[in-house]
Each structure stands twice: as structure tokens, then as C-alpha cells.
């Protein structure tokens, strides 16, 4: 994957100029491989009635942060958040806020509780809010952008998850 992504990053840099690419090269390379095997083709949708415990609800934003690195664990999420906080407490606050907003948006949109508990609705909004905290001057406009961006990213993830998983048989990854 990494050997293939380097030339993709180079091509995207030439095509995008100074516009940040974030995870686009990763998505292009990974989805190219996943389209070949279509891991979700024919998979049954998650059961929306699956209940999760109160502790899983409380930990779901931290699990969402751990999912940035494809880990499904609240302790790992807390460690990642702590590392981000050592760099910048503001970045850590935005990351946690984004993941919380993702969980809340998923809940409002009727996402299966199991998906929320596994952090699947938290990692993209966490990345969105973190990006805003890095590229924008702190203040009410940037907080509003981080909040709105995290909610929009979660909503887009919900739609992309269904469309890509059902129609194409691949996960949405970090596309939204």
C-alpha cells in the first residue's frame, strides 16, 4: 500500500496544488484493492436493535478516536487523545468534540447502536474537527465550523456507508 500511495500522492500534489489532500491518496489506493475483493458484497446490514451498555455509550467517542488508526478500543482512543493533547490541548478538544458530535449525529439519524459503540460514526467527524483546529485561527467561527463540519461529515458517512456498502460492496473509509 505505501509503495503505491507515494506516486498517487505525487500525482495528487501536481493536480491539487496547495489544496490539502488529507487521506485522498489512502482512499484511492485502498479502495482500488477493496474493489477487487468487495468484502461487503452480500453482507447483512447491522441489526439496529442491538443494544449496547451505558459504559459503551460513554466510551464510544474514545473508540471513535481509536478507529482513526483502525483500533476498536476506548483505552487506545484515550491514549491517542492524550498524545494529541500533549501536542495541542486545543487540537485534542476539537478531536473529542468531533467524535462526540459524530456519535450524536449517528444517534439522531438512527444508526445501529453497535456501529456507534464501535466508533464507526466518530472517526471521520473527529478528523474533520481536528483539521479545522489545525488550519483555522481559534475563535467562534472556527468552533462553529468544526461543529458543523463534524455533523456534516457524520451525515455524509451515514449515506456513503449505505451506498458504498450496499451498491459497491466496499466500506466508505475516510471519504466523507
Regions found by a protein language model. Name each.
Residues 1-77, 90-176:
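C-terminal transmembrane helix-loop-helix hairpin of multi-pass membrane proteins
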Amino acid at each position: 500500500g505505501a509503495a503505491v500511495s507515494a506516486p498517487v500522492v505525487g500525482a495528487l500534489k501536481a493536480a491539487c496544488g496547495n489544496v490539502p489532500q488529507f487521506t485522498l491518496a489512502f482512499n484511492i489506493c485502498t479502495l482500488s484493492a477493496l474493489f477487487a475483493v468487495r468484502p461487503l458484497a452480500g453482507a447483512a446490514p447491522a441489526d439496529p436493535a442491538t443494544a449496547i451498555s451505558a459504559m459503551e455509550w460513554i466510551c464510544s467517542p474514545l473508540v471513535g478516536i481509536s478507529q482513526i488508526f483502525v483500533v476498536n478500543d476506548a483505552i487506545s482512543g484515550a491514549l491517542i487523545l492524550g498524545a494529541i493533547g500533549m501536542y495541542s490541548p486545543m487540537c485534542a478538544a476539537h478531536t473529542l468534540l468531533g467524535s462526540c458530535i459524530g456519535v450524536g449525529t449517528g444517534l439522531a439519524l438512527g444508526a445501529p447502536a453497535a456501529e456507534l459503540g464501535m466508533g464507526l460514526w466518530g472517526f471521520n467527524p473527529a478528523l474533520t474537527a481536528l483539521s479545522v483546529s489545525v488550519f483555522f485561527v481559534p475563535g467562534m467561527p472556527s468552533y462553529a465550523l468544526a461543529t458543523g463540519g463534524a455533523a456534516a461529515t457524520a451525515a455524509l458517512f451515514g449515506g456513503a456507508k449505505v451506498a458504498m456498502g450496499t451498491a459497491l460492496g466496499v466500506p466508505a473509509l475516510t471519504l466523507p
